[in-house]
Amino acid sequence: MTTSESVQETLGLDFPHPSKPRVLLAASGSVAAIKFESLCRSFSEWAEVRAVATKASLHFIDRTSLPSNIILYTDDDEWSTWKKIGDEVLHIELRKWADIMVIAPLSANTLAKIAGGLCDNLLTCIVRAWDYSKPLFVAPAMNTFMWNNPFTSRHLETINLLGISLVPPITKRLACGDYGNGAMAEPSVIDSTVRLACKRQPLNTNSSPVVPAGRNLPSS
């Protein structure tokens, strides 16, 4: 996002709500973020998409490969768009704009932050300010031993109580070479899961949709 553009200009908040759902895609610091471009392309086929990336996730995301119509917001934008009292606050404007938020991949670190209520970057500030009458999906991605760690179970229970919907990880050979559960679900699965939720309760173009958030915990 260029600093010369206002938050409202990039989000189109001065215009009527579109017929397509507004999806805010976010990536945190996992090697699975290499699939973020694929996620952006899949979601942009049926939704209006904006993207958020943490500093760590940018190690894995090729920004030049993202669809040209998708604006990617980073932590730097949070500060560059605010100069004085009364200016738009990016994480609040993004929260207002989005009908749905999807965090894929969700790293162990960002999961812990959300469960603990921390808000030290753009992504976690959006989640802390999120209106939980609107759906929020997460697709975790981490090493098997991190996934099986007792802290992970506690953190998943906490976000489950918020109404955050889980797209469970899968078992496969991980980037580190280990074999086990913890790999992010395939982009096609994440896309179809969110799209199905939208179809269950069609978008109301006069207001943000209210899609029931699942409360699923992993079987492991």
UniProtKB/Swiss-Prot annotation:
Pfam families: Flavoprotein (PF02441). Changing C176S: Loss of activity. Changing G180A: Reduces activity. FMN binds at G29, S30, V31, T54, K55, A56, S107, A108, N109, T110, A141. The keyword Nucleus applies. It catalyses: N-[(R)-4-phosphopantothenoyl]-L-cysteine + H(+) = (R)-4'-phosphopantetheine + CO2. Its EC number is 4.1.1.36. Induction: Induced by dark. GO terms for biological process: coenzyme A biosynthetic process; protein homotrimerization; regulation of cell growth; response to salt stress. Its cofactor is FMN. Changing M146L: No effect on the activity. Binds 1 FMN per subunit. N-[(R)-4-phosphopantothenoyl]-L-cysteine binds at N143, R173, A175, M184. Keywords: Coenzyme A biosynthesis, Decarboxylase, Flavoprotein, FMN, Growth regulation, Lyase, Nucleus, Stress response. One of its GO terms (cellular component) is phosphopantothenoylcysteine decarboxylase complex. It is found in: Nucleus. Pathway: Cofactor biosynthesis; coenzyme A biosynthesis; CoA from (R)-pantothenate: step 3/5. Belongs to the HFCD (homooligomeric flavin containing Cys decarboxylase) superfamily. Seedlings over-expressing HAL3 show enhanced growth rate under normal light/dark cycles, enhanced salt tolerance and Na(+)/K(+) homeostasis. Enhanced growth is due to increased cell number of root meristematic zone and root cap. Forms homotrimers. Interacts with HIP1. Interacts with HD1 in the dark. Catalyzes the decarboxylation of 4'-phosphopantothenoylcysteine to 4'-phosphopantetheine, a key step in coenzyme A biosynthesis. Involved in salt and osmotic tolerance, and light-regulated plant growth. Trimerization of HAL3 recruits and activates the E3 ubiquitin-protein ligase HIP1, which leads to the degradation of cell cycle suppressors, resulting in enhancement of cell division and plant growth. HAL3 function in cell division seems to be independent from its PPC decarboxylase activity. Acts as a positive regulator of flowering by binding to HD1 in the dark. This is Phosphopantothenoylcysteine decarboxylase. The gene is HAL3.
